[in-house]
């Protein structure tokens, strides 16, 4: 309470503005924003649970929404259709179509991730380095050598290329590097 009746109490936004502390002004303005990840999960939740959600003020990413829904088989027809024709639609129309087409349900789970076999990556990188070709050609070389039964002979010749620096290019995991080095010595 002020001693004088003429004193006006300023809120944090006004204090920041009058003091021309622009970082404080920005942080005060940011306090009204929702985090992008919360908005994303709110949008996905609205599609899954068929609840109303206004996306006019939200950061709507068609790609991320389609990617999230494509992790579940029952959503694939709707996601496939949007992948083909949805790029020309507005965000609101895209959202409305998915609201209508995706079946209602709880969808929780980890997203699918690519898991590469470090041994395969080592062999492909060795072949690419030896024959000075790109990764796709090295994969073709590997299949041809395997078919002809010559892959073990070639790997025996190439084990000298397996150095610590080369293994760092293959994987950053130190434990895997040691295992790959041990494997290469056994060739």
From Swiss-Prot:
Keywords: DNA replication, DNA-binding, Viral DNA replication
GO molecular function per UniProt: DNA binding; DNA clamp loader activity
Protein purpose: Forms the sliding-clamp-loader together with the small subunit. The clamp loader holds the clamp in an open conformation and places it onto the DNA.
Name used for this protein in its record: Sliding-clamp-loader small subunit
Biological process terms in GO annotation: bidirectional double-stranded viral DNA replication; DNA replication
Taxonomic source organism: Enterobacteria phage T4
Assembly and interaction partners: The sliding-clamp-loader consists of 4 large subunits and 1 small subunit. Interacts with the sliding clamp; this interaction allows the sliding-clamp-loader to open the sliding clamp. Part of the replicase complex that includes the DNA polymerase, the polymerase clamp, the clamp loader complex, the single-stranded DNA binding protein, the primase, the helicase and the helicase assembly factor.
Similarity-based family: Belongs to the Tevenvirinae sliding-clamp-loader small subunit family.
């Amino acid at each position: 309470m002020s001693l004088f009746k003429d004193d006006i109490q300023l809120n944090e936004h006004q204090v920041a503005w009058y003091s021309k502390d622009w970082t404080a002004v920005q942080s005060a303005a940011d306090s009204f924003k929702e985090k992008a990840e919360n908005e994303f999960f709110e949008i996905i939740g609205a599609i899954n649970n068929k609840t109303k959600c206004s996306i006019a003020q939200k950061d709507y990413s068609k790609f991320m929404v389609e990617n999230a829904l494509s992790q579940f088989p029952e959503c694939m027809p709707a996601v496939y259709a949007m992948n083909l024709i949805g790029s020309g639609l507005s965000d609101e129309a895209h959202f409305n179509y998915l609201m209508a087409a995706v079946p209602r349900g709880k969808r929780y789970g980890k997203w699918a991730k690519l898991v590469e076999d470090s041994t395969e990556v080592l062999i492909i990188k060795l072949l690419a380095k030896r024959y000075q070709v790109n990764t796709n050609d090295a994969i073709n070389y590997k299949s041809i050598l395997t078919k002809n039964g010559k892959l073990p002979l070639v790997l025996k010749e190439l084990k000298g290329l397996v150095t610590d620096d080369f293994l760092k290019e293959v994987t950053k995991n130190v434990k895997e590097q040691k295992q790959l080095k041990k494997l290469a010595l056994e060739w």
